[in-house]
Amino acid sequence: MTSVAKPSLDRITKALAVAGAFVAFGCGESNPVPSSSAGRVWVHQGEAQGTTYTVKYVSQDSVSQTAFEACLEEVDVEMNAWRPSSTLSQFNGSTEVGTAFSFADSAGVWEDVWRISEEVHRLSGGAFDVTVGPLMKLWGFRMERRDVVTPTMVDSVRQFAHFAGDVIRFVPKSRAGGAALSKSDPRTELDFNAVAQGYTVDAMAQVLLDRGVTNMMVELGGEVKCLGLNQHSQPWRIAIDRPQEEGRTLQAVLPVADMSICTSGNYRKVSVVNGQRFSHTLDPRTGAPVTHGLLSATVLAPEAAYADAFATACMVLGPEAGQRWIAQMQAQGEEVEALFIMDGAGEAFTYWATPSLEAQLEWLEPLDKYDPTLVE
């Protein structure tokens, strides 16, 4: 498969680690580790999408590494922003306005990711937006550096950087025999960084499910899906990082079964614009960086694509609006749990978690509970 040589610098920092899941085997190998009653434990590792992946599963037989690589390639060829030949790169570079940019979407990747992106955009009230790329560039959150950004500049870019109206349209292949995109401004670009890796994790898990494997942990770039149980017939144990700028400290461990877990954070990427220090989380509804104290948002949902997108939306919404949004989705029957870690007094952090998740957290570094009256 084609690996991405250059990591996506605009990718929101992932604050997630897999506790006890990484095994020191060579890249791309399939290796058994001690057996359980359900079979051997197999581990595949490799590089893809500018990061690394680990697939760990319990089975009598190993699944070929090429099956995972083929799955990764299906997404990569469509949505890798660093691959000039990808469908995404070709569309973003297109200057055609109003005319259809047609492509096969033979694996249905675009149809799936577009549907999820539209849904989360709607559910979050616009906090999740896959057209935010030009605004990220404006603020210097990509490769470019920007010292000054004015409201006039923001308003100008927002005319062609919002996921609504006639700015951009997608026609899925199910209704057209082939998929098609069109944009009303040549500067409009799409950016699926906050959903594509989660979607890929779901697809890799499906590779195992299609072969009868039901106990697995699949991780790509910090996005994780856990199905069934581990080799000890226990839920998979996933560790969450402490949101610190340098070094690494594990904050907590969470047992996870039959759920996906994704974390978004902004604490390792900052820029100085207009004399102010901003994190690299931008609110697409205003076109400006967020200023609240939410440092990381960990979200659990059945599908990794949704957990990935939900976590990004929470980072935009902030601690209080994010809590209300999660509670609203739960009230509507969504299977979603969340953990937020916020700035506290001095060097301290505070946290908020949904009750079910909080009851399962194993704290490695204790935190005080978040008190909104002290910060907002």
Predicted segment positions?
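Mature catalytic core of soluble alpha/beta enzymes
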Residues: T2-L16, F22-E376
